[in-house]
Amino acid sequence: MLLLELPIKCRMCGRFLRQLLAQESQHSTPVGRFLLPMLMGFRLLILVSSGPGVFGNDENEFICHLGQPGCKTICYDVFRPLSPLRFWAFQVILMAVPSAIYVAFTLYHVIGYWEVPGKENKEQETQISKGDHSKDVSGAKSLKLLWAYVAHLGVRLALEGAALGVQYNLYGFKMSSTFICREDPCIGSTTCFQSHPSEKTIFLNIMFGISGACFLFIFLELALLGLGRFWRIYKHKLSFLKKLPTSESSVRSKDTTDELSVVEAKEPF
């Protein structure tokens, strides 16, 4: 019996996954369906493969002239309050949170409205007995997913913009090779040096470029969704206006026919 039930369960799981993927990408354009996931994957790949080699040993390679105990540690803390690797790792996790919430909402939506074989006819009969229309119900479901998708894009856009601003305030566009430190317990001022500033500048600008491209693509996705929504509303109104004169003319012709029949009936023979 278990062997006989296994293919049925596999088909049901496959149907459920297909419906989940279809609902998740129902309202997205090719920008949100392909370009944004590719950029997120590319950012994660660059960060994991090259980040530790560039910034992994940054504190040990930070050198100061004075050998005063604790001077190097304090100067490095002032020079770099937050490690770039930790900042970018936190950024990747933070950007994934809105997408995870949207996928969870879609999963809840699919589980709540997923129709098991044999259940569809019962739901249709219930809707007909209550006077509901299936198109209205499906339209309401689709509208909820659309607004959830737009909201998650808006949150991602705000987070990307905030991350760009924080990254610029922390690191700028160039990693300097020297740093003048005047903090205690250093005696007077000391000059400190960081290793491979050119390599770190290139990596920093690459991460800036990826974040900027993500910001632009999210904004483009929102713009395309707005234009598509406006175009559908415009087409609906246009088709309604095209149908309106024909309906009015048919009503007028019907009224004219009724008036003629009344006049003919009143005329004496």
Curated annotation (Swiss-Prot):
What the entry lists under InterPro entries is as follows:
Connexin (IPR000500), Connexin_CCC (IPR019570), Connexin_CS (IPR017990), Connexin_N (IPR013092), Connexin_N_sf (IPR038359)
Query: What is its biological role?
Result: One gap junction consists of a cluster of closely packed pairs of transmembrane channels, the connexons, through which materials of low MW diffuse from one cell to a neighboring cell.
User: Which sequence ranges are marked TM in the entry?
Assistant: 34-54, 87-107, 146-166, 206-226
User: Which cellular compartments is it found in?
Assistant: Cell membrane; Cell junction, Gap junction
Supply one GO molecular-function term. identical protein binding
- Protein family (similarity comment): Belongs to the connexin family. Gamma-type subfamily.
Query: Positions modified as Phosphoserine?
Result: 261
Ranges of the Cytoplasmic topological domain: 55-86, 167-205
| Top-level taxon in the UniProt lineage | Eukaryota
A Gene Ontology biological process term: myelination
One Pfam family from the UniProt entry? Connexin
Keywords assigned: Cell junction, Cell membrane, Gap junction, Membrane, Phosphoprotein, Transmembrane, Transmembrane helix
What's in the GO CC field? connexin complex; gap junction; myelin sheath
- Which organs or tissues contain this protein? CNS specific. Expression is restricted to brain, spinal cord, and sciatic nerve.
Q: Name residues in a coiled coil.
A: none
Q: Which residues lie on this side of the membrane: Extracellular?
A: 1-33, 108-145, 227-269
Quaternary structure and interacting proteins, as annotated: A connexon is composed of a hexamer of connexins.
Describe its membrane topology.
Multi-pass membrane protein
Q: What is this protein called?
A: Gap junction gamma-3 protein
Source organism (scientific name): Mus musculus
Q: Does the keyword Nucleotide-binding apply?
A: no
